[in-house]
């Protein structure tokens, strides 16, 4: 504090204020709902950093390892995403993902099958309104996908030469979210359009034999999520999503069912198709708590279905799962879940009938930082 002359009323106070840096955030978890064929156990890590290079930007990194009961590595999955603000209303997100899967749970020649995938995505988001109570936005993006297949280390492919398939599509839509005290919800709608320019002429010819013409591949979809705090100890969560394909779609445009899309009690990816629907509901009851820990019971139920049409024939399938979870939360860092689950409309359980999950037991250990 400095003083002008001898008059204390003319004193000047100079303050230097620096914004507190945003810490790294994330979580590490171990679960038993891996991917059928690649292993029951999955280790998942997520880390996020806001204001990394500029105010308002976000870096997100995700990594996953899947292994079978003999600790043989079956899948490696990773992705990185960066969101940069271009203006107060416009944001750009670029992401890149990589995965490699081995069928370590298979027998015979299938055990030597390996698939590798690269995926890139770029999206512009225009935020119309963003307040403490609601958020409106529109988005448009382009996705490119490449799949490589290997059998005993040698490339092969059912579409195109060289052992690789490449496809892409455009995605455009809008989203809305609102927070009304104890009640919050968000919804989104989107449209998909295949882009044949991502595929070679030979690949387009091979896809056409399956009835797939990327230039004609189109779909509409949407999702709705609701969260309602019925009381200080009861929370109801509802979710629904769906997609309708107007023509045959490439695999990267499909609709997927599994625990990765909210159906607890199933492998990460169970089944996919061009069109599909999904609904889930969960009621969380916090029946005991103190200043550092809490215990919760969470009954859940969900189901979905997919369908596809091909020149070789039509395909459709439905699946569901219900159960009860016991959840222990400690110090805002630890989350331990143990549950009984019961899948239904499951005619076969290839590779996962011998899992703990196949016996009706679900487990999860998570640490947040």
Predicted regions and their residues:
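Transmembrane beta-barrel wall of Gram-negative outer-membrane proteins
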Residues: 57, 70-176
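Outer-membrane beta-barrel "beta-signal"
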Residues: 47, 328, 333, 340, ...
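Outer-membrane beta-barrel initiation region
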Residues: 1-93, 130
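Transmembrane beta-barrel strands of outer-membrane/channel proteins
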Residues: 3, 28-32, 45, 59-65, ...
């Amino acid at each position: 504090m400095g003083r002008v002359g001898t008059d204390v009323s003319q004193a000047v106070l100079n303050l230097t204020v620096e914004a507190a840096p945003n810490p790294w955030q994330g979580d590490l978890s171990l679960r038993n709902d891996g991917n059928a064929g690649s292993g029951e156990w999955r280790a998942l890590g997520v880390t996020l950093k806001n204001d990394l290079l500029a105010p308002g930007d976000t870096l997100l990194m995700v990594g996953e390892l899947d292994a079978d009961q003999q600790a043989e590595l079956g899948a490696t999955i990773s992705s990185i995403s960066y969101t940069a603000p271009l203006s107060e209303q416009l944001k750009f997100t670029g992401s890149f993902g990589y995965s490699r899967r081995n069928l370590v749970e298979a027998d015979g020649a299938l055990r030597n099958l390996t698939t590798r995938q690269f995926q890139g995505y770029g999206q512009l988001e225009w935020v119309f309104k963003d307040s403490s109570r609601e958020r409106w936005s529109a988005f448009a993006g382009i996705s490119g996908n490449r799949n490589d297949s290997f059998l005993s280390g040698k490339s092969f492919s059912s579409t195109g030469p060289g052992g690789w398939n490449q496809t892409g599509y455009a995605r455009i839509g809008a989203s809305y979210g609102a927070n009304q005290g104890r009640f919050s919800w968000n919804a989104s709608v989107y449209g998909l359009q295949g882009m044949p320019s991502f595929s070679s002429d030979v690949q387009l010819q091979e896809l056409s034999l399956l009835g797939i013409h990327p230039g004609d591949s189109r779909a509409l979809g949407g999702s709705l999520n609701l969260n309602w705090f019925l009381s200080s100890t009861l929370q109801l969560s509802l979710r629904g999503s769906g997609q309708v394909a107007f023509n045959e779609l490439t695999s990267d445009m499909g609709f997927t069912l599994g625990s990765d899309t909210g159906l607890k009690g199933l492998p990460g990816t169970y089944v996919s198709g061009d069109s599909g629907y999904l609904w889930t509901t969960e009621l969380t009851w916090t029946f005991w708590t103190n200043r550092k820990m809490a215990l919760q019971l969470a009954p859940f139920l969900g189901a979905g279905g997919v369908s596809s049409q091909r020149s070789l024939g039509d395909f459709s399938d439905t699946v569901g799962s219900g159960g009860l979870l016991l959840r222990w939360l400690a110090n805002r860092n630890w989350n331990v879940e143990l549950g009984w689950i019961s899948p239904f409309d499951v005619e076969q359980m290839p590779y996962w009938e011998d899992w703990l999950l196949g016996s009706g037991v679900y487990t999860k250990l998570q640490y947040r930082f």
